[in-house]
């Protein structure tokens, strides 16, 4: 599924502003965690009654990079969003500021299966309080 860049950027920024975890991201963070995923079609936005209620971004990483990321020793780069041939699928951002987390996660699993043709394990890195 191809996304509209301007809509994704506008709706993504709105969700970032509504999230206590994301509202203080700087320009570099916005590029890394929103614009780059939009550029490489590694984002899905979810809507209810025409209003954005959630988004997910992802990339593929090697096992080594994934472990470093998990240990906070690796920062996602734009290149991480390019390839889908690396070993591990990583969910990078999950934003559901209106309490629709379970709905967004379930839709994401279905989306990944449709896009990649397999039921892929999604690795997540849970952050601590902002």
Q: Can you say where each PLM-predicted feature lies in the sequence?
A:
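Short linear motifs in intrinsically disordered
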Residues: 4, 32-36, 112-116
């Amino acid at each position: 599924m191809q996304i509209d860049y301007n809509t994704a950027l506008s709706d993504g920024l709105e969700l970032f502003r509504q999230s206590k975890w994301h509202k203080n991201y700087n320009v570099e963070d916005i590029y890394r965690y929103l614009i780059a995923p939009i550029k490489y079609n590694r984002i899905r936005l979810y809507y209810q009654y025409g209003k954005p209620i959630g988004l997910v971004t992802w990339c593929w990483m090697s096992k080594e990079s994934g472990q470093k990321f998990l240990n906070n020793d690796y920062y996602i780069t734009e290149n991480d969003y390019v390839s889908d041939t690396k070993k591990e699928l990583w969910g990078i951002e999950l934003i559901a500021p209106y309490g629709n987390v379970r709905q967004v996660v379930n839709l994401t699993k279905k989306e990944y299966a449709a896009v990649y043709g397999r039921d892929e394990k999604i690795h997540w890195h849970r952050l601590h309080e902002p």
